[in-house]
């Protein structure tokens, strides 16, 4: 450790949330058809919808990886939690615009999942930090 360096413990909630978002994003990249079914759509999506599913996968994988990485390094995760909430707001607003065209399972899983994600992201951004910083001081050896 360097003189006066700050070390913070791992943000477990940030790591868990980031890992879940990363895994969800990767699932949309690896097999968007299966992931789409998990989110409530039993039908095969059109090629345009598959493109959008993959785009959502890249977005979620990126946000999840950066959130988990910050959590592992003991860095602030607030910004990544806000990015996560923002992504879910976009999903919810987009889903609400086609709400009447969605099947009940899509409404519950897709829109409900986005609403939960918004809550998790906002709470993650504003929650009190219980991880105290520990100051490490190393002394130089005497000559």
Protein language model regions, located:
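Short amphipathic, positively biased membrane-proximal segments
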Residues: 1-143
């Amino acid at each position: 450790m360097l003189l006066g360096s700050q070390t913070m413990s791992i943000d477990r909630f940030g790591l868990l949330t980031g890992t879940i978002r990363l895994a969800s994003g990767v699932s949309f990249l690896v097999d968007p058809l299966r992931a789409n079914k998990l989110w409530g759509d039993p039908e095969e999506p059109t090629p345009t919808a598959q493109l959008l599913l993959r785009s959502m996968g890249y977005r979620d994988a990126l946000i999840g990886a950066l959130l988990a990485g910050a959590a592992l390094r003991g860095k602030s995760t607030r910004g990544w939690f806000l990015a996560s909430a923002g992504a879910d707001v976009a999903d919810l607003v987009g889903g609400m615009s086609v709400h009447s065209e969605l099947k009940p399972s899509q409404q519950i899983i897709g829109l409900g999942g986005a609403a939960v994600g918004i809550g998790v992201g906002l709470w993650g951004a504003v929650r009190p930090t219980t991880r105290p910083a520990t100051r490490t001081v190393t002394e130089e050896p005497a000559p």
